[in-house]
A protein has these predicted regions:
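Residue(s) in the substrate-gating loop at a strand-loop-helix junction
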Residues: 133
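Substrate-binding pocket helix/loop in short-chain dehydrogenase/reductase
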Residues: 89-90, 97-99
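Active-site helix of classical SDR
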Residues: 113, 149
Length: 231
């Protein structure tokens, strides 16, 4: 896809991978609608922020209507990035935290995709990028809830791919390994460090899959740091 002057909706833009993705898209000339809880400090006429909790369908639907009304152009790109994780044994996990993870990581992906897919189907074009995790490929001790959400993201994405390809819509899942962001702030057993990937590395992966040719469909991409424990 040629990215310049296309509209992208990116969720979870306040920090980390979402913020890096917004900046990378803006550098490519993309008009970006950023959906999130807190507005990032971005001064660019092509960036438009819409405050939304993606785990709330009414807010997502309202954000999509506001985006469509303000920008008045079709959406070719959706990056479902919003996500969070909490560390706890399965037995001791608080119900509220469990529900929050599934509401944001899984329901949010469903809600955002649900409101935007119909318009992509009309165009018979579009690309949805779902950010999963290597935690969606193998269980991790103390991270059952988070792993559960990311396994769900991968399964949902595989079904979306099979359903939407016939409508000319690409669906790509990206599974990052450890990334040096504040995602790890509530996780006591892991400290973010320079041996991890940068958020910008994941953003580059997103740009790569978006720029593939029309009949080239990257379905799933796993990216990891080369030396996670240093030299």
């Amino acid at each position: 896809m040629k990215l310049k002057n296309k509209l992208a909706v990116v969720t979870g833009v306040s920090k980390g991978i979402g913020l890096a993705t917004v900046k990378a898209l803006l550098e490519k000339g993309v008009i970006v609608a950023g959906w999130g809880r807190t507005e990032p400090e971005i001064e660019n006429p092509n960036f438009h922020f819409f405050q939304v909790d993606v785990g709330n369908f009414e807010q997502v639907n309202a954000a999509w209507k506001a985006t469509s009304s303000k920008l008045d152009m079709p959406c070719h790109i959706l990056v479902n990035n919003a996500g969070l994780g909490y560390e706890s044994t399965f037995e001791e996990m608080e119900i509220g935290l469990w529900e929050e993870m599934f509401r944001t990581n899984v329901h949010g992906l469903f809600y955002c995709s649900k409101v935007i897919i119909p318009q992509m189907k009309v165009m018979e074009a579009g690309h949805i990028v779902n950010i999963a995790s290597i935690a969606g490929t193998t269980g991790i001790e103390g991270m059952a809830g988070y792993c559960g959400t990311k396994f769900a993201v991968r399964g949902i994405s595989q079904s979306m791919f099979k359903e939407l390809r016939k409508s000319g819509i690409k669906v790509t899942t990206i599974n990052p390994g450890s990334v040096n962001t504040n995602f790890f702030d509530p996780i006591e057993s892991v400290n973010a460090n320079e041996n991890m990937m940068r958020a910008e590395d994941v953003a580059e992966s997103i740009i790569y899959v978006l720029q593939t040719s029309e009949n080239y469909h990257p379905v799933e991409l796993e990216v990891r740091p080369l030396r996670p424990k240093g030299k």
